[in-house]
Curated annotation (Swiss-Prot):
Organism: Trichormus variabilis (strain ATCC 29413 / PCC 7937)
CDD domains documented for this protein: FGGY_EcGK_like
Binding sites annotated in the UniProt record for sn-glycerol 3-phosphate: T16, R86, E87, Y138, D243
Enzyme Commission designation: 2.7.1.30
Protein name, entry field: Glycerol kinase
Family designation: Belongs to the FGGY kinase family.
Record-listed glycerol binding positions: R86, E87, Y138, D243, Q244
Gene Ontology terms, MF aspect: ATP binding; glycerol kinase activity
Binding site for ADP: T16, R20, T265, G313, G414, N418
Annotated binding of ATP, by residue: T16, T17, T265, G313, Q317, G414
HAMAP family: Glycerol_kin
Function, in words: Key enzyme in the regulation of glycerol uptake and metabolism. Catalyzes the phosphorylation of glycerol to yield sn-glycerol 3-phosphate.
Top-level taxon in the UniProt lineage: Bacteria
Cytoplasm recorded as keyword: no
Length: 500
């Protein structure tokens, strides 16, 4: 597995709710880590912003803290891998290095009216054909258009644009490298899925100047060196992946028939489709899994089908911080088990509209079926059940789009800690749910990719074969009721559509 007898890999995971750094040793094990929670800015209902300067400062802090915790020298780090929240984007001044506005987050819905305009003008099919994506405020393109409209009196020759990976790479390299990888670029609604390049026609439709966009490079490759002023040494940055693609890589899902679901702020079910673009008739999106050079220095492209569900872990966070029904996320498991059923209550997790398979920017969240006998436990259980029902809908869509049905679901992310949720997920799917011992698969994927790209490890298969399974949840006695109630949940969803 290893070609390096000593040294370490630094992996950065810059997510929606926080930023993390991990140090991996040559055995592929985590030896140290650091975390910083990220401030969420809600300037208006349906809007969500992040301070890009805060992300950069936190990145510096978690890197230095993780290195200190590992008690190693930065010069011992062989490479850096970077994985990020996708679609979130910003503009910055390349002279001052300062953002021109806060970054607009993937959950932000402010550009829904612009998306409706694109649909009304008949661009939806053209955009899907070229990018594999549906027209939605989720993706970066309309966010960038909004930012360009918002900033006035700025010389565009001085402006750079990018997703979070591009911003952090530019800062890490001291402003020397303005680049992104195919997995992140494929989420902008501006990259041609077949060519792997920015699509000139889409840039024209959205009036986005090509010169402000980063160069697109393979996910595993050479992204430059860290500026020596940062860690007193120049460290190669050798992998960049979107967070869901990094998890796919970390699980070893590198060929058709393998898929995973990450339960984070949202739930994201991704199935590798090999070197072929698979088009779904069921509102799933086609995207890049990851890219890398082969031995002939040609680019190998791996594609994927994805079902993006915008709100899952965010529901649990809302139960805690929004309506203060719980004090900790862990309480939800205990509370859900305190009642025999959902008490007739169904929850629709549409805080930011609905993603796959509905793609309704105007849907909103709701509880249905509340009576005077309903207890807090029923509400909590309804929220957990809704997370699982969303995944069921996407699994059904993937099964209908692929030649053979899914045999098992591999899971990761914070909410997969919840045993009630995982058992209910197995019950509704009717297939085993496999939870690995290593929960941080996203950052593991970034580390593996960076190490393989620099020759720190020589075998992807050997790394993946180290995976250990914590628990397999088999469909149980609750399956019949769970499946029966699914139809009622779907009825609740239909009543939430096109709400605003």
């Amino acid at each position: 597995m290893q070609t390096s007898s000593s040294g370490y890999i630094l992996a950065l995971d810059l997510g929606t709710t926080g930023n993390r750094a991990f140090i991996f040793n040559n055995a592929g094990k985590i030896v140290a880590q650091a975390y910083k929670e990220l401030t969420q800015h809600y300037p208006q209902p349906g809007w969500l912003e992040h301070d890009a300067e805060e992300i950069w400062q936190d990145t510096c802090w978690v890197m230095k803290t993780a290195i200190a915790n590992a008690q190693i020298s930065p010069s011992e780090i062989a490479a850096i891998g970077l994985t990020v929240q996708r679609e979130t984007c910003l503009l910055w001044d390349k002279t001052t290095g300062k953002p021109l506005h806060k970054a607009i987050v993937w959950q932000d819905r402010r550009t829904a009216p612009l998306c409706h305009q694109l649909q009304e003008k008949g661009y939806a099919q053209e955009i899907y054909s070229r990018t594999g994506l549906v027209v939605d405020a989720y993706f970066s393109a309309t966010k960038l258009r909004w930012l360009l409209d918002y900033i006035t009196g700025v010389d565009l020759k001085n402006v750079l644009a990018g997703t979070i990976d591009t911003w952090i790479l530019w800062k890490l390299t001291g402003g020397k490298v303005h680049a992104t990888d195919h997995s992140n670029a494929s989420r902008t609604m501006l990259m041609n899925l077949k060519t792997g390049e920015w699509d000139e026609q889409l840039l024209e439709i959205l009036q986005i100047p090509a010169h402000i966009l980063p160069q697109i490079q393979p996910s595993l490759g050479k992204f430059g060196l860290t500026d020596t002023s940062l860690l007193d040494t120049a460290i190669p940055i050798t992998a960049i992946l979107g967070d869901q693609q990094a998890a796919l890589f970390g699980h070893g899902c590198d060929r058709p028939g393998l898929m995973k679901c990450t339960y984070g702020t949202g739930s994201f079910l991704v199935a590798h489709t090999g070197s072929n673009i698979v088009r779904s008739q069921h509102q799933l999106i086609s995207t890049i899994a990851w890219t890398q050079y082969n031995s002939q220095e040609n680019i190998n492209i791996g594609y994927a089908l994805e079902g993006s569900m915008f709100t899952s872990g965010a529901c649990i966070q809302w139960l805690r911080d929004g309506i203060k029904l719980i004090k900790t996320a862990a309480e939800t498991e205990t509370m859900a088990n305190q009642v025999d059923d959902n008490g007739g209550v169904y929850f629709v997790p549409a805080f930011s509209g609905l993603g796959a398979p509905y793609w309704d920017m105007n849907a909103r969240g709701a509880f249905f079926g509340i009576t005077a006998s309903v207890q807090p436990q029923h509400l909590v259980r309804a929220v957990l059940e809704a997370i699982a029902y969303q995944v069921l809908e996407v699994v059904q869509a993937i099964n209908a789009s692929c030649s053979s049905p899914m045999q098992r679901l591999i899971v990761d992310g914070g909410a997969c800690e919840n045993n009630f949720l995982m058992q209910f997920q197995a019950d509704v799917l009717g297939i085993p749910v496999e939870r690995p011992t290593m929960r941080d698969t996203t950052v593991q994927g970034a580390a593996f990719a960076a190490g393989l790209a620099v020759g720190f490890w020589d075998s992807y298969t050997a790394l993946v074969n180290q995976r250990q399974i914590d628990r397999i949840f088999e469909p149980g006695e609750g399956s019949q009721n769970a499946i029966y109630n699914f139809a009622t949940w779907q009825k609740a969803v239909k009543r939430s559509l096109d709400w605003v």
